[in-house]
């Protein structure tokens, strides 16, 4: 009997020990694999879940004045739920999977607040002959630095063209590198193939006889048109806009256009961008552009698209101002999971393109170039006042100091007549402006979205011809804005600059031209301000700062993973930092 009790007690002790042992083992291994597995890197974030990310510099971009770091962050599904220490993250989220950055740097996903998918879709699958090489998914485009180089590449392209009936579109021509071209010259290149040479600015084009015939463009429709040179086959600014509907069937040809959008998506991911916006939708045709964009976005690429309506283009289509306004106010009905129209925001256009030397500059040009208006000033003022009274945020394309000054007068006048405290009117591009204009921007409560790449691409040539050294070497003076705490973002206006936020940041930080000329070094930005311009300040440009642009609790889990910390890496090499991948809405997408 005693023996039986003894055995029973032994069994109980053994059972109790076994239970405690296996419970301890379970907790130990669960903790080990949940929080300490050194092999779990960002590659493991394959689906929305609960994760703690640590093990490398995490730069939240939430501090407006200086850099700060977090040791760890926690995300749940597509939202950030914690920022702070690793121990506290584990304590609050005991079941989260731990992700080790392995020394790589985490930043908010880059935001590109001004890009045109339609331009990308047209340019990328067609022939690029530009002054500089372009990095494309299928390799580098061939650069042409002179007239002879340009004509040689164009002639070879024509020789290899697949069909006499198919239009040959080529983008990238610029007269300061490639010399003068004309309808007659293009006829000599080919009298049988329709040729459309789109200028580097995408604000003008040259056509040969075959193209003019194919598109049924009539001379009688352009008699005395100030922005058409019929003899040269040259259509620019409003003249170019006038023929776009005639070209639209070919420009929006679905197979080629969708190939271009797919290439754009690849470039966006490769460069760490998780959000893009197009100010000025549509460019050509609302229904067709939206349908093709939806087709691309149904593939669920790792970025979101925000659209800002094009006031003038829609007014032409809708015929009346009130009908246009009703349509604009209904646009959110077209929203999808990853395409959204920004409510109560509108895009207007002021002067001509900086790449065409058509921007309006107060001192004029020192060559034969002349400033142009994309929108006649009286009509621009009328549109501005109307949408100001309707309490829209206005985004306005403005390149030269004369155009910027005109718009600031409109802001001042409108705000006195219909006061608005936080209007945040945003001037886009701002190729050339002065310190005094920056002061006015500050005092009037306006903001900026700028393209610093103009300096790299144009400073040397525009010093030689057009602007002279004083103006050409002071293009896009970003530090004038930073010193005044004016919100400003960087954008590519693709393809006016590479679709690469780090390239834009590097240009603003270093202010070195394509010939390695150091210019206006007092206008260099510090690295933190440059990063703000592609993250939190870019979110503010779009009024999305409560959702995107920084690593803060409640915001979207959109991040970029870099192989180097841009705040400590050598400034001259920032554009060479590798984008390892992005986290978009809580899922990691690798570039490797």
Kindly label every feature range from the protein language model.
Residues 1-17:
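N-terminal secretory signal peptides that target proteins for export/translocation
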Residues 20-31:
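Bacterial N-terminal signal peptides
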Residues 34-36:
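Boundary at the C-terminal end of the N-terminal hydrophobic targeting segment
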Residues 39-40, 44-54, 60, 65-324, ...:
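Divalent metal-binding segments
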Residues 259, 385-395, 399-425, 429-430, ...:
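His/Asp/Glu-enriched, well-ordered alpha-helical/loop segment
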Residues 296-298, 331-338, 418-420, 441-445:
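Acidic (Asp/Glu)-rich catalytic clusters
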Residues 301-346, 424-435, 461-487:
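Phosphate/diphosphate-binding loops
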Residues 339-358, 446-456:
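Non-cysteine beta-strand/loop elements that form the S-adenosyl-L-methionine
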